[in-house]
Amino acid sequence: MSVPAALRTVTVIVAVVLATLGLTTAAQAATINYVALGDSYSSGVGAGSYIDSSSCKRSSKAYPSLYASSSGASLSFQACSGAKTSDVLNNQVGALSASTTLVSISVGGNDAGFSSVMQDCILGGDSGCKTAIANATDYVDTTLPGLLDTVYRTIRSKAPNAKVVVLGYPHFYKIGGSCSVGLSDTSRGYINGGADALDTVIEKEAANAGFTFADVRPAFTGHEICSGSAWLHSVTWPVDESYHPTAAGQASGYYPTFTAAL
């Protein structure tokens, strides 16, 4: 081989190596480092197919798992059943770092005492439900904003380079729907109103933090309890899965709402 030919061969080899390195670097740079924070609506309670035996009930059918599978994102799945804002701060945000590029979170319902409100509505009739919702709404309006502000500020501090998507909660009932027993439509309306109050505060605080709010209510319209095509469990066993999205609710409600916000 002549010297010029040899030089050309070396040049081609070097170019190929550099191109390969460049592709590798670009792929590494494009890796989505995703941390899923929050409560049972993000962990996937009610969707089944739980990843481990912990009480967090993280599901492979929850929207964080679905997104990681479809996008190839590296997922740190921190969301946990029953989590309040304090649990996010104490047990979850440690997974965040400057290399985190995407964060999702749903939180606030447990702080407002959602499970006890539902119990009061089931056992206390319209009057008891109205009182329970009023008390919860007062908490949501006066106390929850400060708690959310602390959580959101902490997320931004620990993950300064991340896009943050805050997901809300659906309406639970279709008014005038197919249910012939159980709560009255009056109580069902109170419960939906409580979800609206919660989402309003979450949306406002998310905007104040510069985060994106993903409203799941439109996606669940027509798929509430009593709709005949529900993506939410009514009272069921295990009882902690009551009033949580089914696998269909995660796949067709939360997941597309989340991805549309990216």
Feature roles, as predicted:
Residues G22-N33, V88-S104, L148-A162, T259-L262:
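Short amphipathic alpha-helices and their capping/turn segments at secondary-structure boundaries
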Residues A29-A79, G94:
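Serine-esterase "nucleophile elbow" of acetyl-processing enzymes
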Residues N33-G38, S42-G44, S74-A79, T101-S106, ...:
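Structural recognition of the beta-strand scaffold that forms the well-ordered cores
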Residues S53-K61, S127-T143, T186-D196, D240-S242:
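A short acidic, glycine-rich active-site loop
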Residues P170-L262:
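Catalytic His-Asp segment of secreted/periplasmic serine-dependent ester chemistry enzymes
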